[in-house]
Swiss-Prot record:
Domain comment in the entry: The presence of a 'disulfide through disulfide knot' structurally defines this protein as a knottin.
PTM statement from Swiss-Prot or TrEMBL: The C-terminal glycine may be removed from PA1b.
Family matches, as InterPro entries: Albumin_I, Albumin_I_a
Signal peptide coordinates: 1-26
Domain of life: Eukaryota
Biological role: PA1b binds to basic 7S globulin (BG) and stimulates its phosphorylation activity. Involved in the signal transduction system to regulate the growth and differentiation as a hormone peptide. Toxic to various insects through binding to a high affinity binding site in the insect gut.
Presence of the UniProt keyword Disulfide bond in the record: yes
Xref: Pfam families: Albumin_I, Albumin_I_a
Keywords of the record: Disulfide bond, Knottin, Seed storage protein, Signal, Storage protein, Toxin
Name of protein: Albumin-1 F
Length: 130
């Protein structure tokens, strides 16, 4: 039951983020996004900075990620980042080629398992069956 509510909330935020970023225009990078959107934030000029594994916020790419990456315990660019932060041993990169960073996992198999289960299609399917 909790996973259905979580999936519903994720889809709501992702949908809201798509509408907010499309209405604002290309010059502004604001709103909620999903790292699984292609391109994230509705334009390749913006970056989706995750605050959770499947949801984030849109920002201009100018230096924001470097500061956020250091502050967030699960964002990573390499396996070494995860080990240094103590958040895991494997940096699982998002399947979206527009996102150059990943999320720390305990192992490669855990990352593969998660990313194979979490896709926009699966989220929408789980919401429609609720």
């Amino acid at each position: 039951m909790a996973s259905v509510k979580l999936a519903s909330l994720i889809v709501l935020f992702a949908t809201l983020g798509m509408f907010l970023t499309k209405n604002v225009g290309a010059a502004s990078c604001n709103g909620v996004c999903s790292p699984f959107e292609m391109p994230p934030c509705g334009t390749s000029a913006c970056r989706c900075i995750p605050v959770g594994l499947v949801i984030g916020y849109c920002r201009n790419p100018s230096g924001v990620f470097l500061r956020t990456n250091d502050e967030h315990p699960n964002l990573c660019e390499s396996d070494a980042d995860c080990r240094k932060k103590g958040s895991g041993k494997f940096c699982g990169h998002y399947p979206n080629p527009g996102i150059e960073y990943g999320w720390c996992f305990a192992s490669k198999s855990e990352a593969e398992d998660f990313f194979s289960k979490i896709t926009q299609k699966d989220l929408l399917k789980s919401v429609s069956t609720a």
